[in-house]
């Protein structure tokens, strides 16, 4: 991964064989990012995304491998109990035009991933919500 910071905006290149969530965490810790939005696109050959069942309060994961274009990767970097936390969703399409997506659990870059991180002044922590079973923004 390489990146360049321009004020509160960080332009990131995640390289072949690097795992996206690991690189986002490394960047956030290195740059002391407590709150930010994330947008990206690129290519992956292995990824896992989940879909949350609200009734069961459980994620169901789907893993894909092959040639995929990341058509959208979006979400937030923030904190939970004062520690790094990220919530990203990703959609990726294959050579048949099929697109798969959900809550990002893991994605390995096959060529490149181009990311823009918009750092916000402030902190928004998360806390577990027993009603939804999710870690929600705490204001």
Where are these predicted regions, by residue range?
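N-terminal intrinsically disordered, cationic/polar leader segments
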Residues: 1-86, 91-139
């Amino acid at each position: 991964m390489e990146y360049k910071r321009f004020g509160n905006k960080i332009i990131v290149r995640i390289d072949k064989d690097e795992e996206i969530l690991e690189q986002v965490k490394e960047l956030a810790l290195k740059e002391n990012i407590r709150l930010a939005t994330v947008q990206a696109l690129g290519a992956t050959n292995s990824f896992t995304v989940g879909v949350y069942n609200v009734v069961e309060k459980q994620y169901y994961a789907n893993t894909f491998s092959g040639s995929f274009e990341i058509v959208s990767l979006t979400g937030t970097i923030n904190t939970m109990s004062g520690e790094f936390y990220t919530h990203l969703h990703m959609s990726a399409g294959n050579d048949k035009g099929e697109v798969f997506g959900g809550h990002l659990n893991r994605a390995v870059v096959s060529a490149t991933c181009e990311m823009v991180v918009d750092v916000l002044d402030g902190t928004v922590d998360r806390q577990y919500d027993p009603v939804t079973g999710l870690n929600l923004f705490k204001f």
